[in-house]
Amino acid sequence: MPSKTSRATSDARQVDQGRLAGALSEHVTAIAAIAPMLCEPDVKTTQVSQLLHGHIAMVMERKGLWLHIKSADGYPGWVHQGYVVTVPEPVPPLAETSWNDPRPLSLGCTVRDEHNATRKLPLGALVTVGQERVGGLAMPLAERRESFPAKADSITASAMTFFEGTSYEWGGVTPWGCDCSGLVSSSFHLHGVNVPRDAWMQASTGAPVDSMSELRPADLLFFSDEPEGKITHVAISLGGTRVVHLALGRGGYAVDDLAAEDEYTKLLVKRYRFGRRILETA
């Protein structure tokens, strides 16, 4: 009888992935530019987040060709094994990977591998061993900490610079397609500030801001459809009444003035619930 390994090698697409078969306690890394994380092990289900190229995740469960993973920020989701490969041990603590990884992090770049194949990487992806940057920008951790300090004006500038023109995509975390909480988490992570992935999680981070008039740049504004309902939207304050956000009602990236009188803005203001200050000195 053929071994599990020999049976797996019968499918050329699964050769590299066959190593995952007994790897429930192992870690994986994304080999695609973006690996969609879904709510169920089914390609037809909803994307809840994304594992970016070079990022590491812990495997919690396996169902057929699907892996239930937990990303470095603790977010769970199902990813098809075609998007990932097993990471050799030892694996560094997940808190030291992802956006805190010392490897060059893409600011939007193109890389070439040892087979001379090129690939575009979005903001937040990691350039891995054997890849050479041939276009765009990528920075190792030490340079990122200097270029992207944990300061309010720098964080808001990054949100506006990198995500301008981005289309709305549920579960997205990059300028290739992003949702409201993805804009927040990616913008803050770039500056070394850890915030949760979802808006309702972000709503319990930091310190409360008593009123909208007290909001400062890089504070977060939270919105819900019902006064006591679950938080469903988040925006980043630019100071005063201006915000930057990824909004379904705007089709994606938008800078809005909450003092405006258009119908969308008036409805948004009605949904405002509270603010939070993530930075100690915003």
Predicted regions span which residues?
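Boundary regions of SH3-family modules and the immediately adjacent low-complexity/disordered segments
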Residues: 1-26, 42, 49, 53-58, ...
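Aromatic- and glycine-rich peptidoglycan recognition patches
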Residues: 12, 86, 209, 232, ...
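Short, basic/aromatic beta-hairpin or loop at an interaction surface
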Residues: 25-38, 93-109, 186-202, 238
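Core beta-strand residues in small-molecule sensory/regulatory alpha/beta domains
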Residues: 38-40, 112, 224
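Glycine- and charge-enriched low-complexity intrinsically disordered segments
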Residues: 92-120, 163, 169, 173, ...
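Catalytic cysteine-centered active-site loop
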Residues: 167-217
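Hydrophobic/aromatic-rich core segments of domains that either
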Residues: 214-227
